[in-house]
Amino acid sequence: MATANGAVENGQPDRKPPALPRPIRNLEVKFTKIFINNEWHESKSGKKFATCNPSTREQICEVEEGDKPDVDKAVEAAQVAFQRGSPWRRLDALSRGRLLHQLADLVERDRATLAALETMDTGKPFLHAFFIDLEGCIRTLRYFAGWADKIQGKTIPTDDNVVCFTRHEPIGVCGAITPWNFPLLMLVWKLAPALCCGNTMVLKPAEQTPLTALYLGSLIKEAGFPPGVVNIVPGFGPTVGAAISSHPQINKIAFTGSTEVGKLVKEAASRSNLKRVTLELGGKNPCIVCADADLDLAVECAHQGVFFNQGQCCTAASRVFVEEQVYSEFVRRSVEYAKKRPVGDPFDVKTEQGPQIDQKQFDKILELIESGKKEGAKLECGGSAMEDKGLFIKPTVFSEVTDNMRIAKEEIFGPVQPILKFKSIEEVIKRANSTDYGLTAAVFTKNLDKALKLASALESGTVWINCYNALYAQAPFGGFKMSGNGRELGEYALAEYTEVKTVTIKLGDKNP
């Protein structure tokens, strides 16, 4: 995602981006059915559910509502596609990579359409959907396409007359449950490495945001993937999500979402067939600003770090620790940034903040804002909803926040910036680590020794130094503690989608 340091999520910073097209406001939704075996199906139950535009609260369309029988049908298709001798299994690794490249080409071709669908369904600014979400999808697909024919085992030295080596083989049918904050991007983070390694998939998009996943199904067929390799079942967590998590013929599941639901997914996986689990869960991420930091950079990065995507990021800079010498100035500048942040119509290219995803999330954020006021934090700006029919909340900044306040402990997932004060490095390390989460952290300092000390001491899967949200397809991403298990992206993701097999051969005793 774009930040003040020039990094782009899942990409290289030196690539010239395409021109921003005119957004398509009233896009016709073509794909609303369940995608199994490269065909479109109605749900077994005949039920449908509505997906709505959070900017207007108006219904976009109705989507087929999957349930356990639909998941069973999808798993059966994925099993058949994975059988030895199937068209998918007969493909060599280079051809698998070529298919992923073809899918990336199609996503790039339809980039404006996918970005418009994402904006309609999530309320995120079209500017961000086009340049960040879709850019990340394309780069992730191309990155793992390149890995397809480079997954290798090792030769292991043993005794004389014995040859021992390892093979990295696909797991089989993999499930994926994706969130509503980055619907297509989080799907691609799972799909690309799984297909690169030769697996088949059953996917459940978030019920709030199913449209880009279903559109991708049409591109998967167009790219030439054999039937059954990718299957997409829209529906709800307690039905489709539970069926995928507990299905005895699904061998691995990847989930991105809340820690609460992640626990349920892992429990269901263990109680069924001990399927392998990758979890990318919540975060209460510390952003540490030292007195010697470049304050302009720190203020801008912390601002983007918490307000990007309406604050609906697992990586959000939701605890900003500022050294006391620069605390007042940091707060002053942060308030200036927040007051100037453009909030409104996500199809307006000047907009940087759209609505929250739904009424439930909207109400939760406002309740946490009220808790901050009641518990003694100083409201510097914002603190209420916008006067609009959509689910918009004013960018909110709190100062004089203490560690025991709810806004400093709970994942807000909204446009709220709590700013805390610290006196020493040892103090801020202890306070930053005093959470059940451990997804990301950031440090702003000009002192290399201090930066490396903090990077080593912070209990987080990712630590950014003098930047924020600098995510790349090449670099692994995942959490410590209750922020999850396993890693997505980078070479490390390949291990999540392969089984290691040891082959040992006893040679004859006779000399040649």
Swiss-Prot record:
Q: Report, as the record phrases it, the tissue specificity of this protein.
A: Expressed at low levels in many tissues and at higher levels in salivary gland, stomach, and kidney.
Tell me the compartments it is located in. Answer: Cytoplasm
Q: Does the keyword NAD apply?
A: yes
* A GO BP entry: Harderian gland development
Name the pathway.
Cofactor metabolism; retinol metabolism
**Reactions listed under catalytic activity:** all-trans-retinal + NAD(+) + H2O = all-trans-retinoate + NADH + 2 H(+); retinal + NAD(+) + H2O = retinoate + NADH + 2 H(+); all-trans-13,14-dihydroretinal + NAD(+) + H2O = all-trans-13,14-dihydroretinoate + NADH + 2 H(+)
A single GO molecular-function term is:
aldehyde dehydrogenase (NAD+) activity
> Sorted alphabetically, which InterPro entries does this protein's record hold?
Ald_DH/histidinol_DH, Ald_DH_C, Ald_DH_CS_CYS, Ald_DH_CS_GLU, Ald_DH_N, Aldehyde_DH_dom
> Entry's Pfam families?
Aldedh
Q: Which PROSITE patterns match?
A: ALDEHYDE_DEHYDR_CYS, ALDEHYDE_DEHYDR_GLU
**Which residues, renumbered to this chain, carry the PTM N-acetylalanine?**
A2
Its biological purpose is as follows: Catalyzes the NAD-dependent oxidation of aldehyde substrates, such as all-trans-retinal and all-trans-13,14-dihydroretinal, to their corresponding carboxylic acids, all-trans-retinoate and all-trans-13,14-dihydroretinoate, respectively. High specificity for all-trans-retinal as substrate, can also accept acetaldehyde as substrate in vitro but with lower affinity. Required for the biosynthesis of normal levels of retinoate in the embryonic ocular and nasal regions; a critical lipid in the embryonic development of the eye and the nasal region.
Which PANTHER family does the UniProt entry name for this protein? ALDEHYDE DEHYDROGENASE-RELATED
What protein name applies here? Retinaldehyde dehydrogenase 3
